[in-house]
Regions:
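Short, surface-exposed connector motifs at secondary-structure boundaries
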Residues: 111-119
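Glycine-rich phosphate-binding loop at the start of an alpha helix
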Residues: 100
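N-terminal catalytic cores of secreted or lumenal carbohydrate-active enzymes
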Residues: 1-97, 109-111
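Residue-level detector of conserved catalytic or cofactor/ligand-binding positions
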Residues: 119-128
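Active-site helix-to-loop segments that bind/position phosphate- or nucleotide-bearing substrates
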Residues: 106
Length: 129
């Protein structure tokens, strides 16, 4: 029996983790620059998923505001997939309410750019009742 395999190019982007925010920020700028160039050079490259978060766009455009139109084109073309959250889901968000608000803000931000991806990894260690 033949099996079909899907490969989803994506990031797992922590704004800060083992380096200072500024160091991660510059790595993000490099990643986004490389992605936008890849979208232009390789029409066969299908898409890249920004890890379910939209704050990446704010962080990138803070350094490269002149790339706004290219980012918009990539999102509109379905090459750059965004949302549905604002920040990366985290076990340590304060409460379930924080996670819901994170999604609501992320959906609102995503819709400003286009259609959000209705898929994300969610891992919450809070016990169910």
């Amino acid at each position: 029996m033949k099996k079909k395999v899907y490969i989803i190019s994506h990031s797992h982007w922590d704004r800060e983790w083992y380096m200072a925010y500024e160091q991660h920020h510059m790595r993000l700028v490099e990643l986004m620059d490389d992605l936008l160039e890849l979208f232009e050079k390789d029409p066969e490259f299908n898409s890249f998923h920004l890890d379910g978060q939209t704050i990446i766009l704010d962080d990138y455009l803070q350094v490269r505001p002149e790339k706004r139109e290219l980012v918009q084109q990539a999102i509109t073309a379905g090459k750059l997939r965004i949302g549905p959250f604002y920040i990366l889901q985290d076990d340590f968000l304060i409460s379930s309410e924080s996670n819901v608000r994170n999604m609501l803000i992320g959906m609102e931000e995503s819709q400003k750019w286009g259609t959000p991806v209705m898929l994300s990894l969610i891992h919450i260690s809070e016990p169910t009742r």
